[in-house]
């Protein structure tokens, strides 16, 4: 009687079990299968019987009991579990120590060479996707759905990491930035938002011009290279107020890049000022705006937007506003809010619409997946996203958005620990020091309000990557005491 192999994932180069670089097999003797089946039917499982029947010492067997998965991740139920008559949780408890693993012929496993490593997928749906990734061919909508559906998340991450390293090697970017939110008064009343307040709400605020400038100065202790400015859709503030905020910042901090106003805000300001979007953008440029952030995109699917943000511009107007900005020479980012009421198809649709616009304009620099934080929102009955969902989203984004230079793991939303792991799942950017982030903390985020350059570098280096400080346009930044120079 032959041996039945059990695949065991062995991880190297990444904390814990988040990057399958080597796959080997342990052989298990099926001789005691009948006895195990009988006991399994009665929910009895004797570890001594099992270890003795498989020529594993009792002490060695006990050392193998872990809570990690030891079956091919592409299968909902391990095939070997059925042949041995084991229940799912019993099979999950069996792992062979790495030191005792035997290498066998891997020819039966699908393999693709990536440099000195090999990709092996236990999910057959990933095979054609892997072939496309190797050939640097574009993935389809169906490929995207398969990536979301696959149980072999480690293989999905492996592919995304391959693309990431092909584009950036080990380089991982961060910047020293300061968030400024001039007002939280907003007419949109989005169900996904814990930041906005109605006019007259005691918790609402609007900064005076001097307060906005002082806020910027208070975050200048590390010589920031970027001001990130977003806020609510205030029903009364004139367009001129926002132009004055920008002019004052540019006058006081001429070297700092100003990344200001989402596509939603720009469309709103244009309506308030009775200007076209193009005219609005030109006035913002004249005042000192250098680029735009990517917020407000949420999910483009009309069905979802009608529930979570029905008073915002729709997905098509968001894309059209971005198109106009890019055609005027502005660079911008793009986001997607996930983990609420959307489905995998909505996510794929969102990503492919961004990809199509990037084909046309080339104006996007970075894609930032944003995990929904339900606390303090009308959707607080929804669960928070899991770490597995977060790292899968990073990986799928990297694989589908082949024309986006960068994928950001926004540590404020994902937590620093998950963001660090994401650096092995396709992300090449951690965002920055941030300093006093409000929007996601109002939604219950418990991450720090900011991080130092030293802390960000530690996260990156511990992940086996090389930290590179950048400015907003991804030029390398060199520092000397409290000053900096940008390599353009």
Predicted regions and their residues:
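Conserved Radical SAM active-site core
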Residues: 197-335, 340-357
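Short alpha-helix boundary/capping segments
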Residues: 23-40
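Short, positively charged and aromatic/hydrophobic N-terminal segments
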Residues: 42-44, 75, 88
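Hydrophobic faces of well-ordered beta-strands that scaffold small-molecule active sites
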Residues: 172-178, 227, 258-260, 292-294, ...
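Canonical Radical SAM [4Fe-4S] cluster-binding loop centered on the CxxxCxxC motif
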Residues: 166-168, 172-211
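Auxiliary Fe-S-binding modules of radical SAM enzymes
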Residues: 91-154, 220, 352, 358-488
């Amino acid at each position: 009687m032959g041996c039945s192999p059990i695949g065991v994932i062995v991880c190297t180069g990444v904390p814990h079990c988040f990057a399958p670089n080597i796959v080997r097999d342990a052989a298990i003797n099926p001789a005691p299968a009948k006895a195990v089946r009988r006991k399994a039917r009665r929910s009895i499982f004797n570890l001594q019987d099992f270890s003795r029947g498989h020529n594993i010492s009792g002490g060695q067997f006990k050392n193998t009991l872990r809570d990690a998965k030891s079956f091919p991740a592409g299968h909902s139920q391990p095939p070997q579990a059925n042949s041995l008559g084991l229940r799912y949780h019993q099979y999950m408890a069996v792992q062979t120590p790495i030191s005792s693993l035997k290498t066998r012929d891997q020819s039966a496993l699908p393999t693709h060479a990536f440099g000195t490593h090999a990709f092996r997928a236990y999910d057959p749906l990933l095979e054609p996707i892997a072939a496309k990734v190797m050939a640097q061919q574009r993935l389809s909508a169906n490929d995207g759905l398969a990536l979301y559906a696959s149980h072999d998340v480690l293989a999905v991450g492996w592919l995304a990491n391959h693309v990431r390293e092909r584009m950036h090697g080990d380089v991982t970017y961060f910047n020293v930035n300061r968030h400024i939110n001039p007002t939280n008064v907003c007419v949109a009343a989005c169900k996904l938002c814990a930041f906005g307040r109605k006019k007259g709400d005691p918790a609402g605020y609007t900064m005076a011009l001097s307060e906005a400038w002082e806020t910027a100065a208070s975050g200048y202790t590390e010589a920031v290279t970027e001001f990130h400015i977003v806020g609510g859709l205030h029903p009364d503030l004139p367009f001129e107020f926002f132009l004055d905020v920008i002019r004052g910042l540019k006058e006081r901090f001429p070297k700092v890049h100003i990344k200001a106003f989402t596509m939603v805000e720009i469309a709103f300001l244009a309506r308030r000022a009775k200007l076209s979007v193009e005219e609005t953008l030109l006035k913002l440029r004249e005042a000192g705006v250098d680029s735009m952030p990517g917020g407000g995109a949420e999910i483009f699917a009309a069905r979802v937007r009608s529930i979570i943000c029905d008073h915002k511009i729709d997905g098509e107007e968001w894309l059209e506003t971005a198109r106009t900005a890019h055609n005027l020479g502005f660079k911008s980012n793009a986001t997607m809010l996930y983990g609420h009421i959307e489905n995998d198809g909505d996510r794929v649709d969102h990503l492919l619409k961004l990809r199509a616009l990037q084909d046309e304009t080339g104006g996007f620099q970075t894609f930032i997946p944003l995990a929904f934080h339900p606390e303090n929102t009308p959707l607080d009955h929804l669960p928070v996203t899991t770490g597995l969902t977060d790292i899968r989203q990073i990986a799928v984004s990297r694989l589908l958005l082949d024309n986006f230079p960068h994928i950001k793991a926004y540590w404020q939303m994902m937590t620093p620990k998950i963001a660090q792991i994401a650096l092995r799942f396709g992300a090449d950017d951690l965002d920055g020091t941030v300093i006093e982030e409000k929007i996601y903390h109002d939604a219950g985020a418990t991450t720090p309000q900011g991080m130092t350059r030293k802390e960000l570098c530690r996260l990156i280096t511990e992940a086996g990557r090389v930290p590179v400080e950048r400015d907003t346009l991804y030029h390398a930044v060199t520092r000397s005491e409290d000053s900096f120079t940008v390599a353009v």
